[in-house]
Amino acid sequence: MNKEELYLAEDNLAAEIEEISEFVFNHAELGSEEFKSCKYLVEKLKEHGFTVTCPYLDLDTAFRAELYCGEGPKVAVLPEYDALPGYGPNKDEVAHACGHNWIAASTLGAALTLAKFKDQINGTIVVIGAPAEETTGGKCDIANRGGYDDIDAALQFHLGAENNMNIMTLAMDSIEFRFQGTASHAAAYPEKGVNA
């Protein structure tokens, strides 16, 4: 598998990827109520040979799909598919103001494209659908329940005003601080403490 083969495989899936985006767009649902979109995405993954768990971690509209391709790392893509109130044609309607229909389509598109090369990949392709990203933060719920603990790498796509390859955000980068010192009670034994 090389880049040209990947591009060709993606091109061959383009109509299906657009169909995914249109379905999710046309069935805009609020967070934790994405039953139609969740079911559609799950069925699409099953059609391509993925084994699916839904609901996932007791979250009704979360799912986890896997395609085992041999020993190796587990690499996940993370679709979002909830919508927001007040952005539809009428101000009280639900719509995809943040492009979650596109996020769902692009992440599934990446997984389905890689699935075409399952005999050439070592590892597992994982798709973890996170509900309620605009409200309660479905990815946080999944993380707090251990849903990413066995994942070696996770990829997320999002719309923006420009095409960027290198972006630093606090949510995507981590910084670790280590403080060294000696703890003591500030009132009883302040002289025994060493500030970090």
Where are these regions (language model features)?
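Histidine/acidic-residue-rich, glycine-tolerant segments that coordinate divalent metal ions
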Residues: 61-64, 84-97, 101-102, 119-196
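Acidic/His- and Gly-rich active-site-bordering loop/insert found
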Residues: 2-97, 101-122
